[in-house]
Amino acid sequence: MSSNDSNDTDKQHTRLDPTGVDDAYIPPEQPETKHHRFKISRDTLRNHFIAAVGEFCGTFMFLWCAYVICNVANHDVALVAAPDGSHPGQLIMIAIGFGFSVMFSIWCFAGVSGGALNPAVSLSLCLARAVSPTRCVVMWVSQIVAGMAAGGAASAMTPGEVLFANSLGLGCSRTRGLFLEMFGTAILCLTVLMTAVEKRETNFMAALPIGISLFIAHVALTAYTGTGVNPARSLGAAVAARYFPHYHWIYWIGPLLGSILAWSVWQLLQILDYTTYVTAEKAASTKEKAQKKVKPAVPLLWLKSNFPLLFFISRSLALNVIIFGKN
């Protein structure tokens, strides 16, 4: 075996996969058996720990920033007389806070743990087989603990009561709230699947559309449900506020159903093998355009071929006009 082959083998043995896609990696010299996929090696435990730390730090950073911004936005005296009211300025501020917070948090920790930062997103990734079920459970625990920690930290660091907890408003019923949470989460999870899981040249920019989708979800839902779309966010805020409404379950069931709905749409596209047909259609269109040569119009060709004759005739006419004009 050459030295290069030896170095490659050493690199394979020490390879870690913090995103969880390659949890069950088996060294080449060990034949795979039915027991290997259930075996937990030291490197696998280390990978899970790295992912747990990444998800905790990313979720904490995201939710702490969002909670504080939401608290500032909701400390408006205009809401004292109308607690169910909603001001466009406040909605935009809250939406920007959550959208930009999740955007930079994903960019920071996507390379460490995948940057799900949301149990509903983690479920979609698990259903899409982007992460293993074990990694999904690890991410869930880290995200939920981070949500409670972020809620406690935001509550302790800011004066006044906690105003970032989720609650129904504008007369929204529990059933409507459930479906709003489901569809809002489905938009977010589908954005993750289509921009981060699908292999594209723009994968490195996935945090941008994900942040925009969360921004849009907050603009649409905040007045009605307070915009959960993230069980860790809803639980952390409820713990900080010590307020668990009897309909708190909609902030869990709704996002999880939305996660499954998003995966169903994504899975349908995979069954249809849309990438193959879209690529073939684009290639055919490009080939057709290349085969079409741009030809000048017929009048232009005639003028070009008869230019000397036309020049002689026009010159003769001009001279005749001049001669007759003098006469």
Swiss-Prot record:
PROSITE patterns: MIP. It comes from the Eukaryota. Residues 1-34 are annotated as: Disordered. A motif (NPA 1) lies at residues 118-120. Pfam families: MIP. Coiled coil: none annotated. Residues 70-91, 158-176, 225-248 are extracellular. It is a multi-pass membrane protein. Its main location: endoplasmic reticulum. Residues 1-48, 113-136, 198-203, 270-327 are cytoplasmic. The chain crosses the membrane at residues 49-69, 92-112, 137-157, 177-197, 204-224, 249-269. It is found in: Endoplasmic reticulum membrane; Cell membrane. GO terms for molecular function: water channel activity. A motif (NPA 2) lies at residues 230-232. Keywords: Cell membrane, Endoplasmic reticulum, Membrane, Repeat, Transmembrane, Transmembrane helix, Transport. GO terms for cellular component: endoplasmic reticulum membrane; plasma membrane. PANTHER family: AQUAPORIN TRANSPORTER (PTHR19139), MIP17260P (PTHR19139:SF199). Belongs to the MIP/aquaporin (TC 1.A.8) family. Water channel required to facilitate the transport of water across membranes. Involved in sporulation, freeze tolerance and osmotolerance. Is non-functional in most laboratory strains. NCBIfam families: MIP. Aquaporins contain two tandem repeats each containing three membrane-spanning domains and a pore-forming loop with the signature motif Asn-Pro-Ala (NPA). This is Aquaporin-1. The gene is AQY1.
